[in-house]
């Protein structure tokens, strides 16, 4: 490709074409060589990926061994992508083109200013020429005016008689002619100065180098020059017309010859005067001859003198008129010569300006045509190179899009995997919380049962004491009740400080109590007069305030310990654990019974017992009438303790249930074990009546107390766990196979069909190696490895990943291989961790991520792999400090999953991988909805594609393969 060869590419800016050619010319090479150096040869050629992959040694540990150490593979190195270098070269080329465009814009701006200055000067010259023409016309008008005045004065001279006035008129005429001559001289001087100035400007413009100025002129200069030429031509035509009119006027003035008219007028005037004077003389002579004879001579002499005077006057007038004629002729001749000289100079100057303008226009046009041709050639070449580069970029962008699609699928699988792990954690935490709630309820029930038994024992003991006591004698002494009434009332015992069962024997050993039963009762009037602060009746037991703790409004929870107080009694375990509702109902029944017994038995009791019951106002004040101040406080503390423990357990259960419901992925879907636990204990947790939550806003714990139906997640039922029979079959089959008994193969198949992952993996290895009478069948080996991997065996996951990566026993799929390597790596398999790191490092099956590769190398190195440690050290230099810190933290926080977690994960895997998903993947790929692997495994991309298809078909966009969606997809499958 030469610098001048034409090339044709549409859509290229001429400026960019010219700039590219100019840069190539400055570099001393052709445009193609320059573009090759800038775009392709800038950072050096990269090696062929396939050759690079063949030259690099790999670690493929693919031999099958019997021990538990699975093989590992080495991934070939991948070449780096060249899109970055091409983009960098294009950026540099764009920057250079923009700089050249800036320089061109600056040059064009300067040329524009120069052209504007030239046009301004041309306009000034035109205005000066118009001013000169106007001055010429003014001078001609003044000349015409003066000529009219001279003609008028000559007419007056002719009409008037000869005398002093004629001389004055001639002098005035001479003065006017002098003024006219002065005006003409001044006009000539101004014209000369204007012409000299115009010549100087033209010389100044022509003295510069016009070729240097013309080279920088662009298309707009031609248009403006054409406009200037048009205006100049119009001005020249107007100036020519003005000069032509001036010439006509000067010709008229010249042909008029005012001196000839004056001479003829004077001659006719003289002849007329002569005739008149002759006639007058003859008449006067006749009259004189008639009238006088002596005086005739004197009159004749007088007339002779008069004739002489008249003749002298005529001679002077003739001489003056002749002089005036000569002056006028000279003035006209001089004016004519000067006007002709000015016209010739103006014509030559205008002709010179027109020639210069034409030459400049021709040069500019030539330069512009040459620049257009050069720019067209440069842009054609640049367009060809850009088209080639565009094709390469399109190919690389397509490959990048394909890699991005694979990366998106990988991300979707990772998201699904993370979601699966989160669900497992939620299930574990929910199960733990359910167990804790159950244990808490059991402890609460035991405490309540112990408290109830102790209360019953105390009540029965008090009842026995009341029955054994003698009947009270009639009142004999009045001072005794007064002394009893004036006894100071002890303060009520606080349930948070005293041990509520520390005075268990106070009913029989209390001295105050014995005095109370032995003392005779006082008259009723004494009790009516005595004033006690606590004598007013209180509200019935278990009123609305007593349930404030259950409502969650008690600001301070009990601080006393329960277990140490009840540990000494060791009550028997209840035959059946009571629910929270049963406890509440029994407490209500006890309160109602206490109130009823207090109302009925109060009349039959003594006044002292009645007064004591009124003063106490406690829950158990009506049982036997034996309660003192201290025993009342003990019993109240027991009931309060039971209620507080019950309320705390209920609130804890409600809060945990609400939290579990709110932490699920879907508002209507709960984990299966949580849903079962809630359904099994819904009767125990539900609270009605006063125990319902009365706080505004309905806290989150209320969610667990609602009676709404819990809808489980729409997933298929997980596979049943392997039974002990399958495990026993597997152990028996292994013993027989290792001893050489081929009947163990059938037992192994039965165990594998029973869903035992270890048996499935063992059978897969037998099909792979062809041992013990089993033929080599890689397809069967792959199938059984997949079943074992779905069952949660990490070795099977690693083996299945190798099958997918190498394409043994089925199609090759690096993305699926990376997924199974990831699952095995999560379970702590070192070789899978190493292989997964290699996949992330090379970008096979997953998006290339050096930080993730470094993390898995570090994890494998911590597990004892020295090669992984070396790889991690080599890869550390390629990471930023922040990425390295993040990867190190992730590696330190890594904990391998247990077999229980794997089993839980594998139970959800068969639900996602089924034939229906495979059909959906194939059909949606044909219809253009889905682009990804057709492995029958659910992914976010597949769910989005299914939702889009359902939306287009007018179905609910659930994202799952329901019956209607499967029927419509099956039409395309058939």
UniProtKB/Swiss-Prot annotation:
Record key words, sorted:
Cell cycle, Cell division, Coiled coil, Differentiation, Membrane, Repeat, Transmembrane, Transmembrane helix
GO cellular component entries: membrane
What is the predominant subcellular site recorded for this chain?
A: membrane
Where do the record's region annotations for Disordered lie? 460-497, 589-611
* Gene Ontology BP term (one): cell differentiation
Cited InterPro entries? Peptidoglycan-bd-like, PGBD-like_sf, PGBDSf, Sel1-like, Sel1_AlgK, TPR-like_helical_dom_sf
Q: Where are the transmembrane segments?
A: 642-662
Query: Is tRNA-binding a UniProt keyword of this protein?
Result: no
Q: Which parts of the chain are coiled coil?
A: 81-163, 218-320, 375-469
The record gives the membrane topology as: Single-pass membrane protein
Modification after translation is described as: Two isoforms exist, the full-length translation product PodJL and a C-terminal truncated form PodJS. Both appear during a specific time period of the cell cycle to control different aspects of polar organelle development.
Q: What's the stated role of this polypeptide? A: PodJL provides the positional information for the localization of several polar organelles (pili, adhesive holdfast and chemotactic apparatus) by recruiting structural (CpaE) and regulatory (PleC) proteins to a specific cell pole.
Q: What else is known?
A: PodJS must be degraded to preserve the asymmetry of the next cell cycle.
**Name of the featured protein:** Localization factor PodJL
Which organism does this sequence originate in? Caulobacter vibrioides (strain NA1000 / CB15N) (Caulobacter crescentus)
């Amino acid at each position: 490709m030469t610098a001048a060869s034409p090339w044709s590419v549409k859509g290229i800016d001429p400026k960019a074409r010219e700039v590219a050619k100019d840069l190539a010319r400055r570099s001393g090479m052709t445009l193609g060589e320059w573009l090759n150096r800038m775009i392709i040869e800038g950072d050096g050629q990269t090696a062929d990926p396939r050759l690079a992959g063949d030259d690099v040694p790999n670690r493929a540990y693919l031999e099958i061994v019997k021990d538990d150490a699975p093989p590992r593979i080495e991934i070939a190195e991948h070449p780096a992508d060249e899109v970055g270098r091409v983009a960098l070269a294009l950026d540099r080329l764009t920057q250079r083109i923009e700089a050249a465009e800036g320089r061109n814009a600056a040059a064009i701006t300067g040329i524009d200013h120069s052209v504007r200055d030239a046009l301004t000067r041309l306009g000034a010259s035109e205005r000066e020429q118009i001013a000169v023409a106007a001055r010429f016309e003014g001078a001609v008008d003044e000349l015409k005016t003066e000529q009219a005045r001279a003609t008028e004065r000559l007419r007056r001279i002719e009409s008037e008689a000869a005398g002093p006035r004629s001389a004055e008129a001639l002098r005035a005429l001479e003065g006017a002619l002098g003024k006219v001559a002065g005006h003409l001289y001044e006009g000539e001087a101004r014209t000369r100065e204007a012409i000299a100035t115009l010549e100087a400007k033209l010389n100044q413009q022509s003295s510069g180098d016009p070729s240097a100025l013309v080279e920088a002129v662009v298309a707009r200069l031609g248009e403006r020059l054409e406009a200037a030429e048009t205006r100049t031509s119009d001005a020249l035509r107007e100036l020519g017309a003005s000069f032509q009119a001036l010439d006509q006027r000067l010709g008229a003035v010249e042909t008029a010859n005012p001196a000839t008219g004056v001479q003829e007028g004077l001659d006719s005037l003289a002849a007329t005067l002569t005739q008149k004077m002759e006639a007058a003389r003859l008449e006067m002579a006749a009259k004189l001859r008639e009238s006088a004879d002596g005086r005739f001579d004197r009159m004749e002499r007088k007339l002779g003198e008069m004739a002489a005077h008249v003749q002298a006057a005529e001679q002077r007038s003739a001489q003056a008129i002749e002089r005036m004629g000569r002056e006028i002729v000279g003035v006209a001749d001089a004016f004519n010569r000067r006007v002709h000289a000015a016209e010739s100079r103006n014509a030559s100057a205008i002709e010179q300006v027109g020639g210069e303008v034409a030459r400049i226009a021709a040069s500019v046009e030539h330069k512009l045509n040459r620049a257009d041709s050069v720019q067209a050639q440069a842009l054609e070449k640049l367009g060809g190179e850009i088209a080639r580069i565009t094709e390469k970029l399109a190919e690389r962008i397509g490959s990048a899009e394909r890699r991005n699609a694979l990366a998106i699928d990988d991300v979707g699988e990772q998201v699904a995997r993370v979601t699966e792990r989160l669900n497992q954690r939620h299930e574990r935490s929910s199960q733990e919380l359910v167990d804790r709630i159950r244990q808490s309820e059991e402890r609460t029930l035991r405490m309540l049962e112990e408290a109830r038994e102790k209360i019953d024992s105390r009540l029965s003991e008090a009842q026995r004491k009341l029955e054994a006591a003698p009947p009270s004698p009639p009142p004999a002494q009045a001072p005794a009740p007064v002394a009893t009434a004036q006894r100071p009332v002890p303060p009520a015992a606080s349930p948070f400080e005293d041990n509520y069962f520390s005075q268990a024997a106070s009913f029989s050993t209390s001295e105050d109590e014995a005095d109370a039963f032995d003392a005779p009762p006082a008259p009723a009037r004494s009790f009516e007069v005595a004033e006690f602060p606590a004598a007013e009746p209180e509200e019935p037991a278990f009123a609305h305030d007593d349930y404030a703790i259950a409502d969650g409004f008690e600001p301070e929870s009990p601080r006393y310990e329960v277990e140490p107080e009840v540990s000494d009694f060791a009550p028997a375990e209840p035959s059946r654990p009571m629910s929270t509702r049963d406890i509440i109902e029994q407490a209500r029944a006890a309160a109602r019974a206490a109130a009823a017994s207090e109302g009925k038995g109060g009349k039959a009791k003594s006044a002292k017992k009645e007064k004591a019951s009124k003063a106490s106002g406690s829950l158990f004040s009506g049982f036997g009438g034996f309660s003192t101040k201290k025993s009342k406080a003990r019993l109240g503390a027991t009931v309060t303790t039971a209620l507080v423990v019950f309320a705390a357990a209920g609130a804890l259960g409600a809060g945990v249930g609400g939290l579990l419901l709110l932490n699920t992925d879907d508002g209507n879907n709960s984990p299966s074990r949580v849903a079962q636990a809630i359904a099994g204990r819904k009767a125990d947790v539900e609270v009605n009546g006063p125990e319902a939550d009365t706080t505004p806003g309905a806290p989150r714990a209320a969610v667990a107390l609602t009676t709404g139906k819990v809808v489980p997640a729409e997933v298929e039922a997980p596979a049943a766990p392997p039974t002990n029979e399958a495990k026993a079959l597997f152990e028996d089959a292994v013993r027989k196979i290792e001893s050489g008994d081929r009947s163990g193969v059938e037992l192994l198949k039965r165990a594998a069909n029973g869903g035992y992952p270890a048996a499935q993996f063992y059978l897969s290895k037998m099909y792979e190696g062809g041992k013990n009478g089993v033929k080599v069948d890689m397809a069967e080996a792959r199938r059984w490895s997949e079943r074992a991997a779905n069952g949660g065996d990490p070795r099977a996951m690693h083996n299945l990943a190798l099958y997918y990566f190498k394409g043994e026993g089925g199609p090759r799929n690096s993305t699926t291989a990376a997924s199974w390597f990831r699952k095995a790596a999560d379970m702590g398999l070192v070789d899978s961790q190493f292989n997964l790191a290699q996949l992330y490092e090379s970008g096979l099956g997953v998006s290339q991520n050096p930080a993730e590769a470094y993390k898995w190398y570090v994890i494998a190195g911590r597990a004892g792999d020295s090669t992984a440690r070396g790889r991690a050290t080599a890869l550390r230099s390629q990471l930023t400090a922040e990425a390295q810190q993040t990867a190190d933290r992730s590696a330190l926080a890594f904990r391998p999953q247990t077999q229980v977690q794997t089993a839980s994960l594998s139970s959800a895997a068969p639900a996602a991988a089924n034939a229906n998903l495979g059909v959906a993947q194939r059909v949606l790929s044909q219809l253009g909805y889905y682009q990804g692997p057709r492995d029958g495994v659910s992914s976010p991309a597949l769910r989005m594609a299914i939702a889009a298809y359902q939306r287009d078909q007018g179905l609910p966009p659930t994202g799952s393969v329901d019956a209607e969606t499967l029927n419509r997809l099956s039409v395309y499958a058939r």
